[in-house]
A protein has these predicted regions:
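Exported/periplasmic ABC-transporter solute-binding proteins
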Residues: 1-125
Length: 125
């Protein structure tokens, strides 16, 4: 088995370490990649390779494996049955106003959430 991973300091790697690996370390022999796209390409082009990847980077070039018998679907991630999900947060300095509020209203509205889904991510609403 060829292990592929994101580089140290990657948010994707940090989430995988925390949620899956816990105190175990990723092998020193792992092929390290600087982006999720490069990680996907490595798995797609390397026989016997395995890696972890953000939902939005999944495509038909790689096979997504179930965890604990649960498929990695939008529904399973949203309802909490898929065991590896990481929330992301939006932060502002104080109460959002002006263009910041307009952006948040847009991205959380129907049109913005449709864009989120079209990009391969899971909408929050």
């Amino acid at each position: 088995i060829i292990v592929a991973s994101r580089e140290e300091g990657s948010g994707t790697r940090d989430a995988f370490q925390e949620l899956v690996m816990r105190d175990a370390l990723i092998t020193e022999n792992a092929i390290l990649q600087q982006s999720n796209g490069a990680l996907r390409t490595t798995v797609a082009n390397t026989p016997n390779a395995i890696a972890y990847l953000s939902f939005g980077y999944l495509d038909k070039s790689v096979k997504v494996l179930p965890l604990d018998g649960v498929e990695a679907t939008e529904e399973n991630a949203s309802n909490g049955t898929y065991p590896v999900v990481r929330p992301l947060n939006m932060l502002t300095n104080g109460e959002p106003q002006g263009v910041v509020k307009a952006f948040l209203d847009f991205i959380l509205g129907p049109e913005g959430q449709a864009i989120v889904r079209a990009e391969g991510y899971i909408p929050v609403k």
